[in-house]
């Protein structure tokens, strides 16, 4: 079968999912339909906002479905009428069997980790938070349990000590697009040899990648320098690590922290103590040193570098982070 004859249905929603779709379209593959999340109001004006995948699909005049429920009979029938040979899922949602089992060649997913590591909703964040020096991208066939299907292909990607989650996300997004094409070609040429995840060699324990909530993002200043540093970059720029900045009078304000620096220095200060010159730097005491805050944001304000914030916000010794 030629690639032009292979009928592909593509499912995805955020920016991360646009790259693979773009590479499929520009590569001359036959994308017969796109499925994305329903439109949602966003921002202060609650204006209806299209998902990045929908925006791209409209630009390319691709047929589009936006089901509220994936088991809805009308949606399932519309999907069936596209007569897909293969379905590709990138950053979408959990599919019911009636959907993933429909195409004759199956449905494969692009997952932003080296499965079986980091199964779950936030694999890129957790790899950086945990201080990993390597992650990767995986294509695998869908089956009943989430992120457990047979692995088709993987690509490894280094994580630099200075990388935040945005940098790693963008690396994986580009490589993921290429891997989707390679996986489609392997399926077309019947050269796929899927490997069960339980048969794959794993170094160390399996780590999950659960969804991240606001409380997940609160900084624990009782952690070592390196752990706090990794935590901040693993949540930067979104959803952002945060802490309560408490004044000597006991007034607290939530502060988001986007960028930091490690300082290994012995001290006798209580954990969470803020050390500042009021002009250039803010350091927070942790058990084995300090975390220097380089970029931050106060409620209702824009993100600023520390010296910019200190020009308009009076901060002195006596403050602490909670």
Swiss-Prot record:
InterPro entries assigned to the protein according to its UniProt record, in alphabetical order: Fmt (IPR005794), Formyl_trans_C (IPR005793), Formyl_trans_C_sf (IPR037022), Formyl_transf_N (IPR002376), Formyl_transf_N_sf (IPR036477), Formyl_transferase-like_C_sf (IPR011034), Met-tRNA-FMT_C (IPR044135), Met-tRNA-FMT_N (IPR041711)
Enzymatic reactions: L-methionyl-tRNA(fMet) + (6R)-10-formyltetrahydrofolate = N-formyl-L-methionyl-tRNA(fMet) + (6S)-5,6,7,8-tetrahydrofolate + H(+)
CDD domains reported in the protein's UniProt record: FMT_core_Met-tRNA-FMT_N, Met_tRNA_FMT_C
SUPFAM superfamilies for this protein: FMT C-terminal domain-like, Formyltransferase
Keywords: Protein biosynthesis, Transferase
One Gene Ontology term, aspect cellular component: cytosol
Gene Ontology biological process terms in this record: conversion of methionyl-tRNA to N-formyl-methionyl-tRNA
Pfam families registered for this protein in UniProt: Formyl_trans_C, Formyl_trans_N
GO molecular function: methionyl-tRNA formyltransferase activity
Keyword Protein biosynthesis in annotation: yes
Enzyme Commission number(s): 2.1.2.9
Binding positions for (6S)-5,6,7,8-tetrahydrofolate per the UniProt entry: 113-116
Family: Belongs to the Fmt family.
Protein purpose: Attaches a formyl group to the free amino group of methionyl-tRNA(fMet). The formyl group appears to play a dual role in the initiator identity of N-formylmethionyl-tRNA by promoting its recognition by IF2 and preventing the misappropriation of this tRNA by the elongation apparatus.
Protein name: Methionyl-tRNA formyltransferase
Organism: Bacteroides thetaiotaomicron (strain ATCC 29148 / DSM 2079 / JCM 5827 / CCUG 10774 / NCTC 10582 / VPI-5482 / E50)
